[in-house]
Amino acid sequence: MSALPKLPQTSPDARTAPRPVLRVRGMRADDLDAVMQIESAIYPFPWTRGNFADSLTAGYDAWVFAAAEGAGRELLGYAVVMWIPDEVHLLNLSVAGAMHGRGIGRAMLDWLMRDAWRRGARGMMLEVRPSNQAAIALYRNAGFAQIGVRKRYYPAPHGAREDAWVMFRRLDDE
Ligand SMILES: CC(C)(COP(=O)(O)OP(=O)(O)OC[C@H]1O[C@@H](n2cnc3c(N)ncnc32)[C@H](O)[C@@H]1OP(=O)(O)O)[C@@H](O)C(=O)NCCC(=O)NCCS
């Protein structure tokens, strides 16, 4: 994933708030305003609108997650997944800042892993910044292990670069 992580802006009571029931559907071009609003708020180095548009054009799996009840069309999160024959590469996993720490990221990741497994993928790979402690905790708790490092992969403040950890999890029917 290409953006510099920020620790989630979690309010003190966020983790005790109930996780909304999520519904998922494919991302469409008319979601991009809402997606970019979230993306630019949670990443110092966000994907551009063009990155998302290109992902849709390329036929990557792109999903948006919203509350099943109440909040209407308001997006809570989104993800982009690229298939590489029998594995998937998680390119973007993002939750709206105000909703961090409520179990939404984990629920989205679990759904993505199940969906990929059902459709024939037997592994999921991703890149993450070593400084992104929330994301690393999420992935480790979900069964991912670090399998490599890509040196100076991400942009960082003041023209610096940050490594990426490559993490992988075999998918199964659990
Ligand atoms: C990373 C992200 C997707 C996690 O989503 P979330 O909905 O906030 O996370 P969840 O509430 O589902 O928590 C899942 C696990 O992540 C970890 N986690 C979440 N927030 C954390 C924090 N602030 N500090 C440390 N660990 C944290 C915990 O292990 C948690 O599981 P547990 O509480 O059951 O042990 C979300 O914070 C986000 O969108 N961040 C900005 C974008 C980003 O960095 N995306 C990932 C790029 S690789």
What are these regions (language model features)?
Residues A96-D110, W117-R119, G123, R129-A137, ...:
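Conserved glycine-rich acetyl-CoA-binding loop
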